[in-house]
């Protein structure tokens, strides 16, 4: 077999989390992105949950924010770069370019920020990984090929099984991740986009402060995205019993937990914190009406450094 040299060996990356909850005593800039959280839903929940306004009292809530794209794959690169994808180049080329040309990343680097990225779904290569202190090339091994077969068969069955059996073929991406053993890694823990895992790690470790360079952290969590595996208090439930509204409340519980940990640390006043989503929610197939199918209502809450208010600003 002859090749032109265009084929490249698959590279595995670890998005390390050892420093995820370690802040700088100088300055910090954190973007906490909660997938699929619709601002219309949060606005409705504000009346039912006055604790939202209390916990986010130092934030400004931009309830009329309009998102750029309706899906994560397009939205997140735009959020990080401000560069539209015009469909005039391969998407991987665009994904690489937005890192290299991002005014946000360029400014952060010029100002001496150490950058951490916790979003394994974005484009990455060995050249770009050096921009981020927590991304490393590692080896992965399966802990059990037998256990791997079950989610793999469900994945295959979702396409090839008869329609009535497809409902039995749902699976979670985490089912694969749980079977991976990371080798040759410089960090003991990896970033998790699963909300309850992120929250449990936060509650266990807390937020600490160190004498170090300024820090930028981009943290992308599953948020209110399907499957709906949480009740309103972030307890795990059968996804068939879950709803979007419950998932939205659960992800707000996690976001408030992060804010409170930060508030109780010495890093609160020197941290810019943006709590946002990549896009809104478009309803289920059983719903109808024009408003149901609009996904542009993205969540946006912003707290500046040394910013304090008596109640959340809207």
Name each region found by the language model:
Residues 1-314:
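Catalytic domains that recognize anionic headgroups
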């Amino acid at each position: 077999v002859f090749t032109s040299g265009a084929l490249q060996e698959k590279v595995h990356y670890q998005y390390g989390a050892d420093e995820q909850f370690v802040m700088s005593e100088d300055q910090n800039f954190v973007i906490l992105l909660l997938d699929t959280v619709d601002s219309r839903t949060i606005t409705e929940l504000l009346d039912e949950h006055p604790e939202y306004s209390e916990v986010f009292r130092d934030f400004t809530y931009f309830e009329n924010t309009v998102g750029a794209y309706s899906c994560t794959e397009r939205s997140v690169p735009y959020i990080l770069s401000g560069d539209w994808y015009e469909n005039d180049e391969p998407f991987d080329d665009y994904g690489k370019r937005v890192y290299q040309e991002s005014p946000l990343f360029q400014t952060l680097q010029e100002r001496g920020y150490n950058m951490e990225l916790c979003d394994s779904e974005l484009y990455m290569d060995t050249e770009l990984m050096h921009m981020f202190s927590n991304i490393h090339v590692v080896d992965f091994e399966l802990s059990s090929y037998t256990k791997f077969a079950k989610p793999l068969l469900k994945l295959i069955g979702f396409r090839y099984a008869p329609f009535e059996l497809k409902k039995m073929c749902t699976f979670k991406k985490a089912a694969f991740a749980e079977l991976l053993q990371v080798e040759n890694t410089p960090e003991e823990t990896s970033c998790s986009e699963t909300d309850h895992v992120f929250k449990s790690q936060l509650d266990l470790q807390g937020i600490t402060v160190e004498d170090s360079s300024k820090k930028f952290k981009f943290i992308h969590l599953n948020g209110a995205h399907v499957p709906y595996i949480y009740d309103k208090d972030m307890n795990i439930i059968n996804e068939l019993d879950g709803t979007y509204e419950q998932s939205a409340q659960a992800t707000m519980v996690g976001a408030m937990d992060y804010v409170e940990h930060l508030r109780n640390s010495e890093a609160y006043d020197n941290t810019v914190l943006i709590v946002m989503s990549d896009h809104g929610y478009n309803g289920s197939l059983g719903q109808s009406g024009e408003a149901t199918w609009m996904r542009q209502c993205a969540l946006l809450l912003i707290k500046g450094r040394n910013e304090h208010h008596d109640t959340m600003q809207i």
